[in-house]
Amino acid sequence: VNGETLATGVSGAVLGGAVLTPLGLGVPGAVVGGLNGLVSGSRRIYDWNQPAGWAAFLLDSTWGLIGTGAALGVHALQQTRRDRGTYRPDLSERQNRHIYDTGVTVRKHFAMTVGNTVTNLGGRRDLLERHEMVHVWQARLFGPVFPLLYGTWTALGALAGTAAWVRRRDGLRKNVDTFAYYHNPFEYWAYRRQGYWPSSQPQPLYARRGRGRGNRT
């Protein structure tokens, strides 16, 4: 164990434990913060020469602990794969993130971001820098509110998409995708940041308008 791994592991545990102790969750907080510190320290992902690196570590260890804990679960799942997710140190080291070229994802051909970790990138650097990194920082800045808002929008959007399909019978999946995914403010933000809006994927009748270059995938 090198010095950085030890320092980030101990610091992460202290920070995670301290922030959740008032909620009676000091031990889980310390475990998540400490494990993230150990994994991230051993992979040297945080850029200590820039304020963003310190902010990333502090947020991952405190306000963003839910996303960080979920990311630890992703790391564990990646280790069960034969290729271990094809970890990309060249895209991770001192860049405040963990990047995998393959691995777990909720949709085929789509990258997936969980906390400070991106999987199934497939070498798409522009997608990483201009879309997935938006999600990494959304998880950090919105903290425990992020999964709540994202999940609530997804659920309500699925209901709205289903209702639209019942009314017009013009493609259930595309309607649900449009309302639950593409209209999700967090996804809309990332697509606009990437310059890929309007996407060609949403149901045209309900798609938001805007300037863009095409679709993400």
Please report, for each region that a protein language model flagged, where it lies by residue.
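Membrane-embedded multi-pass helical conduit in multi-pass membrane proteins
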Residues: 26-53
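Charge-biased, low-complexity intrinsically disordered regions
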Residues: 1, 9-22
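Active-site scaffold of zinc-dependent metalloenzymes
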Residues: 96-126
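Metalloprotease/metallohydrolase-associated module, dominated by Zn2+-dependent proteases
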Residues: 4-13, 51-83, 94-96, 100-108, ...
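Transmembrane helix interruption/hinge and helix-loop junction motifs
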Residues: 17-27, 142-143
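Catalytic Zn2+-binding segment of zinc metalloproteases
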Residues: 133-152
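Short alpha-helical catalytic segment bearing the HExxH-like zincin motif
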Residues: 124-136
